[in-house]
Amino acid sequence: MRCPKCGGSKSSVIDSRQAEDGNTIRRRRECEDCQHRFTTYERVEERTLVVVKKDGTREQFSRDKIFNGIIRSAQKRPVSSDEIEALVNRIEQKVRSSSDNEISSDFIGNLVMDELAELDEITYVRFASVYRSFKDVGELESLLQQITKGVKKKREE
């Protein structure tokens, strides 16, 4: 494993433990050249999934793409990277549990939106505004009304 700081190829594992999702091993490493400490994650290599986009093009499934999209939506919000990592793990697990090797981008986007609605409403709205490509303020307004109705129902329960 190359050191992200100096590029050295020799590192030793200081700590190794199972991550919260149960499917990943978290390893704490130390570079033998510069003593920089960094974290790596090890997980089982899964079958290749293909995402079919709205325009019909296909690309390989990327959990990093989901993670980065959520990170952008959650900027300056009280959402930790651990919460986002757990959310992405749940989404990936749902996608991989599907029997199909091809998954629509709509299916993935809806999974992300469902998870974000539970995590943080502002992050949800930010993600939705990009994902759904709102044409005007009216579309955004109707989404906000749906969220408001959902919040009222939760408070009544």
Swiss-Prot record:
NCBIfam families: transcriptional regulator NrdR. This is Transcriptional repressor NrdR. A zinc finger (unnamed) spans 3-34. Binds 1 zinc ion. The keyword Lipid biosynthesis does not apply. Its cofactor is Zn(2+). Residues 1-26 are annotated as: Disordered. It comes from Streptococcus gordonii (strain Challis / ATCC 35105 / BCRC 15272 / CH1 / DL1 / V288). The gene is nrdR. GO terms for molecular function: ATP binding; DNA binding; zinc ion binding. Keywords: ATP-binding, DNA-binding, Metal-binding, Nucleotide-binding, Repressor, Transcription, Transcription regulation, Zinc, Zinc-finger.
